[in-house]
UniProtKB/Swiss-Prot annotation:
Belongs to the SELO family. It is an enzyme of class 2 (transferase). The gene is ydiU. Its cofactor is Mg(2+); Mn(2+). PANTHER family: PROTEIN ADENYLYLTRANSFERASE SELO, MITOCHONDRIAL. It catalyses: L-seryl-[protein] + ATP = 3-O-(5'-adenylyl)-L-seryl-[protein] + diphosphate; L-threonyl-[protein] + ATP = 3-O-(5'-adenylyl)-L-threonyl-[protein] + diphosphate; L-tyrosyl-[protein] + ATP = O-(5'-adenylyl)-L-tyrosyl-[protein] + diphosphate; L-histidyl-[protein] + UTP = N(tele)-(5'-uridylyl)-L-histidyl-[protein] + diphosphate. One of its GO terms (molecular function) is AMPylase activity. Nucleotidyltransferase involved in the post-translational modification of proteins. It can catalyze the addition of adenosine monophosphate (AMP) or uridine monophosphate (UMP) to a protein, resulting in modifications known as AMPylation and UMPylation. The keyword Transferase applies. InterPro entries: SelO (IPR003846). This is Protein nucleotidyltransferase YdiU. The active site is at D261 (proton acceptor). ATP binds at G92, G94, R95, K114, D126, G127, R177, R184, D271. Keywords: ATP-binding, Magnesium, Manganese, Metal-binding, Nucleotide-binding, Nucleotidyltransferase, Transferase.
Length: 495
């Protein structure tokens, strides 16, 4: 790979080429005296940026918001959306600044600062992000990528001593996020709600041409009928969203704020706020302290994904005024999700395929884990040990070890029906059952270290989370049960 200096990155600011109504051009108002806490060489490689640039003043200036991206076009985008099921009207990038788009070896990547100051869309916000939430977002995107789940990426984390008032006084930070696009469901809702079909068409054409060109081609992504391109777009987004929900469920991930303005049109995990990877398994686990009704609980995420797709379809109705055709596309969501989820869970259980009778086997395990407070990640990981003949670590996760053992006997009988060798089965299970996930207490340890100016915990976590399925000697503490003090940790929308 040919490494490039920051000033030599090739830019292609495609979103900025849209009509002016889609955004506001502006300059960030970043925190004072910024310091680079961490930069991500893996993300830099996506745009061909030489990691040697991390130590330059130019890198700090650009990714703190004190200087523009060379060749970029800084702006904040407008969008609308439903928040907690209620129409919230116009929203937009209230503390995010799109610096520009870079053409890298892996395609185009938009670079966006989060926390670099107010925009016309800040509403009652101050445009700031705090250290706590910025460390969590920086780590989460890389953790999800390591798990193989579609996500935005993190490039840089800059900190400042500027005070920021939240529930308490915290300090400011700026995180640089990367994605092929930050267009959301709410981007389409905005123009639909404003009854501006011309802008809606411009946005749809932009998304199709840039990311779903197959929707222009009959027999590829374009569906039959007069509005085949728009229906094809909805079908593609529906499929990606269903697959994303299956990914989340399979690793015990809760997003926490599945508002339509946080739903990526590309099926990426977007906007890491009060997210969480489950420790003790609960079917109705709520990771967001602000979600008092449990709208975005773990077991509701797939249905919320579909609800959000209905809002997207409603916004596309002007371009494809055929309710039955739109509904027919959305009717395909459940089958895609179920097949994908069952496929992922079959792998986690060591099954070559998911048969109808396996539904009961899986449901009984989840109910047992729920009733007995078993750890989600370790319960599945230790199934591989049980297959190797070491059942006790799995059974020890349950209060009623006999009940866990009885369930495992049923799984072992199911395994016997396909005749696969135990070692090969266990190895395959380890490849889909992570050992390391970004538990809240691990993120908290990294936050506390970062507050002292120490990025060492971030380094350790990135090392582990980039290879979450492979045991790495010397890091047992990062793969164990959450400590008792972790039960008191709460995350909310306050960041």
């Amino acid at each position: 790979m040919k490494w490039l200096r920051l000033q030599d990155l090739p830019t292609d600011n495609s979103f900025a080429a849209l009509p002016a109504e889609f955004y506001t051009r502006l300059q960030p108002r970043p925190p004072a005296a910024p310091r680079l806490l961490h930069a991500n060489a893996e993300a830099a490689a996506l745009i061909g940026l030489d990691p040697a640039e991390f130590s330059t003043q130019a890198f700090l200036d650009v990714f703190s918001g004190h200087a523009p991206l060379p060749g970029g076009d800084t702006l904040a985008a407008v969008y609308s959306g439903h928040q907690f099921g209620v129409w919230a009207g116009q929203l937009g990038d209230g503390r995010a600044h799109l610096l520009g788009e870079v053409r890298g070896p892996a395609g185009g990547w938009e670079l966006q600062l989060k926390g670099a100051g107010m925009t016309p869309y800040s509403r009652m916000g101050d445009g700031r992000a705090v250290l706590r939430s910025s460390v969590r977002e920086y780590l989460a995107s890389e953790a999800m990528h390591g798990l193989g789940i579609p996500t935005t990426r993190s490039l840089a984390l800059v900190v400042s001593d500027d005070p920021v008032m939240r529930e308490t006084v915290e300090t400011a930070a700026v995180v640089t996020r990367m994605a092929p696009s930050f267009v959301r469901f709410g981007s389409f809702e905005h123009w639909s709600a404003r009854r501006q079909p011309e802008q809606l068409r411009v946005l749809a054409d932009y998304v199709i041409d840039r990311f779903y060109p197959e929707c222009r081609v009959a027999g590829a992504g374009r569906l039959d009928g007069e509005h085949g391109e728009i229906l094809g777009l909805l079908a593609a987004v529906t499929r990606r969203t269903a697959l994303l929900m299956a990914d989340w469920q399979a690793v015990g991930f809760c997003h926490g704020v599945m508002n339509t303005d946080n739903m990526s049109i590309l099926g990426l995990t977007l906007d890491y706020g009060p997210y969480g990877f489950m420790d003790t398994f609960q079917l109705g686990h709520i990771c967001n302290h602000s979600d008092s009704e449990g709208r975005y609980a773990w077991n509701r995420q797939p249905s919320v994904g579909l609800w959000n797709l209905y809002r997207l379809a409603s916004s596309l109705h002007t371009l494809a005024p055929d309710p039955e055709a739109l509904r027919a596309v959305l009717d395909g969501y459940e089958a895609v999700f179920t097949q994908a989820f069952h496929g992922r869970m079959a792998g986690k259980l060591g099954l070559p395929q998911f048969l109808p009778e396996d539904e009961t086997l899986l449901d009984d395990l989840l109910q047992l884990m729920h009733q007995q407070g078993a750890d989600f990640t370790l319960a599945f990981r230790r199934l591989g040990e049980a297959v190797r003949g070491q059942r006790q670590p799995f059974e020890d996760l349950f209060i009623d070890r006999a009940a866990a053992g009885a369930w495992y006997d049923r799984l072992a009988a199911r395994h016997a029906s396909d005749g696969r060798a135990a070692q090969a089965r266990a190895a395959a299970m380890d490849e889909v059952n992570p050992l390391y996930v970004l538990r809240n207490h691990l993120a908290e340890q990294a936050i506390r270290a970062a507050a002292r100016g120490d990025a060492g915990e971030i380094d350790i976590l990135l090392k582990l989370l980039r290879n979450p399925y492979k045991q790495q000697p010397g890091y047992d503490a990062y793969a164990g049960l959450a400590p008792d003090w972790a039960a008191g940790l709460e995350v909310s929308c306050s960041s």
